[in-house]
Amino acid sequence: MLDYRFPTALQMVLSAAMAEQMGERSTSAILAYGLEANPSFIRKLMVPLTRDGIIVSTLGRNGSIHLGRPADKITLRDIYLSVIEDKKLWASRPDVPARCVVSANACWYFKSVADEAEQASLNVLARHTVASALEAVKNADTSGCDPVPEMIARFKKAH
């Protein structure tokens, strides 16, 4: 089963950062619209992101979602660890009976390789911040899309 928590959380945080840069509001409804995701999934991901100080959410009619600290102080590793928590990158098979040299040693060997790969991935994510990721996205953009979802413009017209 594919796990979309990290890429969705990354897009949420980048969207909130973009909205902040533009002086616009960001809400769970706006994020859900921009991500074409279920609003309940967005709210579920907001829990660990808020707990870990990555985002701050204010309630009420004018409530919004903001970054919990400066964009250059939030790494992609922070976001990943927040939403993935203790789930391993790759799950190893349960220990199997030792019937030959391979079955006696494959589990520990796989775990050591998986741990090394996971650490390498975390090191890469630690080198990227929300600020650098947002700058890269903006610099590479050729979509012609508005910086924030058009839902914000519709929201402004209604209020």
Which residues does each PLM region occupy?
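Short alpha-helical segments that sit at the start of domains
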Residues: 1-13
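A short alpha-helical element within helix-turn-helix/winged-helix DNA-binding domains
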Residues: 25-36
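Beta-hairpin "wing" of winged helix-turn-helix
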Residues: 52-68
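Conserved segment of winged-helix/HTH DNA-binding domains
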Residues: 71-96, 114-119
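C-terminal regulatory/oligomerization modules of transcriptional regulators
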Residues: 93-159
